[in-house]
């Protein structure tokens, strides 16, 4: 399954979840596209609920199915902690996500573009791989040639707050993951147990 590249508002309404973090997609119509009103959502089967929850999480991070599933498999090899939360931590440690959490981009999709275009440094070295796994304490910064990119400056200015597990210096345009997040600090609307149940049946 390829990565979804269509309108984020349509996908957000289908999933009942804001994919940009702003909630704007659901502000006017928080029901499925094509549905005649908010009360006509059909009841899902157990499999349907698991699939829907998996899709919510996958689309939130903007990943294709193969990449998402492979990351889940990696999470199964971590011996400490719970599988669902370990999976979410791996998603959170992706470079594109950390760039987004730092407020260097307004969406994860934009953060991925910044990484792909070589605007982002990790410990002073350019990294253009969005899936790069960030370690606690590594410094994420903007390349000197990119510090005046309007979209980056606009994102920093528009960011009103950042998670407690990151630090950021707006003057230097750099920050870091200071610790791993707690479960209640990330995606509280997701029931990761349903995602685990879905993949346990598939793998």
Curated annotation (Swiss-Prot):
Coiled coil: none annotated. Residues 93-156 form the S4 RNA-binding domain. GO terms for biological process: ribosomal small subunit biogenesis; translation. Pfam families: Ribosomal_S4, S4. SMART domains: Ribosomal_S4, S4. The keyword rRNA-binding applies. GO terms for molecular function: rRNA binding; structural constituent of ribosome. Keywords: Ribonucleoprotein, Ribosomal protein, RNA-binding, rRNA-binding. PROSITE patterns: RIBOSOMAL_S4, S4. GO terms for cellular component: small ribosomal subunit. One of the primary rRNA binding proteins, it binds directly to 16S rRNA where it nucleates assembly of the body of the 30S subunit. Part of the 30S ribosomal subunit. Contacts protein S5. The interaction surface between S4 and S5 is involved in control of translational fidelity. Belongs to the universal ribosomal protein uS4 family. This is Small ribosomal subunit protein uS4. It comes from Streptococcus suis (strain 05ZYH33). The gene is rpsD.
């Amino acid at each position: 399954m390829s990565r979804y590249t269509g309108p984020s508002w349509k996908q957000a309404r289908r999933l009942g979840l804001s994919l940009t973090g702003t909630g704007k997609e659901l502000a006017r119509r928080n029901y499925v596209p094509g549905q005649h009103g908010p009360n006509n959502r059909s009841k899902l089967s157990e499999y349907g609920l698991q699939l829907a929850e998996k899709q919510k999480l996958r689309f939130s991070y903007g990943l294709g199915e193969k990449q998402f599933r492979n990351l889940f498999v990696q999470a199964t090899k971590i011996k400490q902690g719970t599988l669902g939360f370990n999976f979410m931590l791996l998603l959170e440690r992706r470079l594109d996500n950390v760039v987004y959490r730092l407020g260097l981009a307004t969406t994860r999709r934009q953060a991925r573009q910044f990484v792909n275009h070589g605007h982002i440094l990790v410990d002073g070295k350019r990294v253009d791989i969005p899936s790069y796994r960030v370690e606690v304490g590594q410094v994420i910064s903007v390349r000197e040639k990119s510090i005046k990119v309007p979209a980056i400056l606009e994102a920093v200015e528009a960011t009103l707050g950042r998670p407690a597990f990151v630090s950021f210096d707006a003057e230097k345009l750099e920050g870091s993951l200071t610790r791993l997040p707690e479960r209640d600090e990330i995606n509280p609307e997701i029931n990761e147990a349903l995602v685990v149940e879905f993949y346990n049946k598939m793998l």
